């Protein structure tokens, strides 16, 4: 029988392959397609003076972009993370690491997550599933993940539906809020709570804010459907049918963004889930996000070369800057007031 860490590594290998080769898109849309910017034909701004810089979690970013968490723990994942880190360093944007539970069981997997030597200046986010706090992971171990990778913050991801569509997934989701509070109080860095593609509701966001969470990654539906990923991993027809039945589950990203921003003007929001371009990112900023995250198209590019992922990031940044010029927005603050049609 495979040990837990071997199962983790096998699952990560399968996840990469499925994400690269299968259609695992949610049937729901992110919602950003319903927003239209009002074109400004005379912006009276020099394109070269467009300013996409921002500060997030105390780090300066050249653009409000996060390479969302993808992978780790395998040789292929190491290559992917190294290329992503190099691209993030070049562009001056943030990067999230994939789930790091395997590192707590297999110390040698650190080489697949350790990218700080490649990207000394980026905002780097360590990552582990929040549910692992119910399965023995301690605040001290969470701090270890941060220290081992020299990360600037820790993501606790919420992946309840994904876990329940895995035959080996974790089932106990009770009493996590007090444990999340403990991690927040223990860690030397900020804690981000993130969904993985089904969105954060108003009620969940309020509960998290009430225990001290100051940064949320809403990760709504409209992009990768992890139940579809698990459907491809299913070992029998029953598992496949259970996972496949949730392809249209979740809160579209735009709806989640509106819900969370409605209950708090102060919480920092990362908008991710189904964003495909810098235009979508601009819409997310306009609707209240501080920064936006992308993963799917970057994974497909980075599996081939660092050059291709850097090119994809430059495309996204140029789309954002052109959108800003064509809405008369010289800065990201200006963009939050751009005229739109819903």
Swiss-Prot record:
User: Is Magnesium among this UniProt entry's keywords?
Assistant: yes
Which GO BP terms apply? isoprenoid biosynthetic process
EC class (word): isomerase
Which transformation does this protein catalyse, written as a reaction? Answer: isopentenyl diphosphate = dimethylallyl diphosphate
Listed binding positions for substrate are: 11-12, 99-101, 162
Q: What is its EC number?
A: 5.3.3.2
| UniProt subcellular location | Cytoplasm
| Residues given in the record as Mg(2+) binding sites | 163
Keyword annotations from UniProtKB, A to Z: Cytoplasm, Flavoprotein, FMN, Isomerase, Isoprene biosynthesis, Magnesium, Metal-binding, NADP
Source organism superkingdom: Bacteria
Cofactor requirement: FMN; NADPH; Mg(2+)
Q: Which GO terms describe its molecular function?
A: FMN binding; isopentenyl-diphosphate delta-isomerase activity; magnesium ion binding; NADPH binding; oxidoreductase activity
GO cellular component terms, A-Z? cytoplasm
Tell me the residue numbers annotated for binding FMN.
68-71, 99, 127, 194, 224, 274-276, 295-296
Give one Pfam family. Answer: FMN_dh
Q: PANTHER family in the record, alphabetically?
A: ISOPENTENYL-DIPHOSPHATE DELTA-ISOMERASE (PTHR43665:SF1)
What role does this protein play? Answer: Involved in the biosynthesis of isoprenoids. Catalyzes the 1,3-allylic rearrangement of the homoallylic substrate isopentenyl (IPP) to its allylic isomer, dimethylallyl diphosphate (DMAPP).
How this chain assembles, per its entry, is: Homooctamer. Dimer of tetramers.
Assigned protein family: Belongs to the IPP isomerase type 2 family.
Q: What is this protein called?
A: Isopentenyl-diphosphate delta-isomerase
Phylogenetic classification of the source organism: Bacteria, Pseudomonadati, Pseudomonadota, Alphaproteobacteria, Rickettsiales
């Amino acid at each position: 029988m495979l040990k837990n860490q071997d199962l983790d590594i096998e699952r990560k290998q399968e996840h990469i392959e499925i994400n690269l080769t299968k259609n695992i898109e949610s049937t729901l849309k992110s919602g950003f397609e319903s927003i239209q910017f009002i074109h400004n034909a005379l912006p009276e701004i020099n394109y070269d003076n467009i300013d996409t810089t921002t500060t997030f979690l105390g780090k300066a970013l050249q653009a409000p972009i996060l390479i969302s968490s993808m992978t780790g723990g395998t040789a292929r994942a190491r290559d992917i993370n190294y290329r992503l880190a190099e691209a993030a360093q070049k562009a001056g944007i943030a990067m999230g690491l994939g789930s790091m539970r395997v590192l707590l069981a297999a110390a040698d997997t650190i080489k697949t997550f350790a990218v700080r030597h490649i990207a000394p200046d980026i905002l780097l986010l360590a990552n582990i599933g929040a549910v692992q706090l119910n399965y023995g992971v301690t605040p001290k171990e969470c701090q270890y993940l941060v220290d081992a990778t020299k990360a600037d913050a820790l993501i606790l991801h919420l992946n309840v539906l994904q876990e329940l569509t895995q035959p080996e997934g974790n089932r106990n989701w009770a009493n996590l809020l007090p444990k999340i509070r403990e991690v927040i109080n223990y860690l030397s860095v900020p804690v981000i709570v993130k969904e993985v593609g089904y969105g954060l509701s108003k009620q969940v966001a309020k509960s998290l804010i009430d225990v001290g969470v100051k940064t949320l990654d809403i990760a709504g539906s409209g992009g990768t459907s992890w139940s579809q990923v698990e459907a491809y991993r299913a070992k029998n027809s029953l598992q496949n049918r259970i996972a496949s039945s949730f392809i249209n589950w979740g809160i579209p990203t735009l709806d989640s963004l509106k819900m969370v921003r409605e209950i708090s003007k102060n919480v920092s929001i990362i908008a991710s889930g189904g964003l495909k371009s810098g235009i979508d990112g601009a819409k997310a900023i306009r609707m209240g996000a501080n920064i936006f995250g992308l993963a799917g198209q970057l994974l497909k590019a980075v599996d081939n070369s660092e050059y291709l992922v850097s090119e994809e990031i430059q495309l996204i940044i140029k789309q954002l800057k052109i959108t800003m010029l064509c809405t008369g927005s010289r800065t990201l603050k200006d963009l939050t007031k751009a005229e739109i049609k819903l």
